[in-house]
């Protein structure tokens, strides 16, 4: 079924891919369960899982069957029409999240970009001309311009200025800093944090998840949105679905 011939990795040859990733000189051609294989059959244990997106393993028979069945039935019609599988998936996600509505996107960055837009729209609806969002130091929210600007890592921001304005940065886990920001910035509309910081070093707040409970209370007090970036922690990666 697959007649594509894959050439071995040649590190001394020019690549047509833009050099934006620090890639290792190795190429995988297939996977099975927790293992990856090169063209010559060398087996590697996959502890990276596609940066946490292949947690159910490679070539899982149930997933492969579902993808093949859907591809043979219907791939895409656009959001201009009702898609029953999409509706069913949204219902499931809403149930496990304890929420009412779902917006599907193509990436973590697009999801976070959408969250930032929702926060700004929320502010504009209240007559706030320049809404601000509180974000955390050492965070990572994506590489689009808005999510890059929300990210608390100068290394990934370098060379892409001027950044998008409207973000107030506080130390991760510091409730007092959030309360202080509330005093000096009456135009805050949301707090945007990762429950556990991923790229920043797998950081948890010193006070544990009571940090999120305190954020919830502050958001209720000030009528702010509480937005959680669970691109890395969601979908069961911590033992809880969210």
Spans of model-derived segments:
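Conserved N-terminal phosphate-binding loop of PLP-dependent enzymes in the Aspartate aminotransferase
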Residues: 2-242
């Amino acid at each position: 079924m697959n007649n594509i011939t894959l050439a071995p990795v040649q590190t001394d040859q020019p690549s047509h891919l833009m050099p934006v990733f620090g890639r290792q000189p190795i190429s995988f051609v297939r996977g099975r369960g927790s293992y990856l294989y090169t063209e010559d059959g060398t087996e590697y244990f996959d502890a990276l899982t596609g940066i946490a997106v292949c947690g159910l393993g490679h070539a899982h028979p149930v997933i492969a069957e579902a993808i093949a069945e859907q591809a043979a039935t219907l791939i895409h019609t656009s959001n201009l029409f009702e898609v029953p599988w999409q509706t069913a998936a949204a219902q499931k996600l809403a149930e496990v999240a304890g929420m009412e509505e779902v917006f599907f996107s193509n990436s973590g960055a697009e999801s976070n970009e959408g969250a930032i837009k929702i926060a700004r729209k929320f502010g504009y609806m209240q007559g706030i001309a320049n809404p601000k969002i509180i974000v955390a130091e050492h965070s990572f929210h994506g590489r689009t311009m808005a999510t890059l600007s929300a990210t608390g890592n100068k290394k990934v921001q370098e060379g892409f200025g001027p950044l998008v304005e409207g973000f107030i940065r506080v130390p991760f886990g510091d409730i007092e800093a959030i309360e202080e920001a509330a005093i000096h910035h009456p135009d805050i509309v949301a707090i945007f944090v990762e429950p556990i910081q991923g790229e920043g070093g797998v950081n948890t707040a010193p006070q544990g998840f009571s940090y999120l409970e305190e954020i919830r209370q502050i958001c209720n007090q000030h009528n702010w949105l509480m937005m959680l970036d669970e691109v890395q922690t969601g979908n069961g990666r911590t033992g809880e679905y969210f």
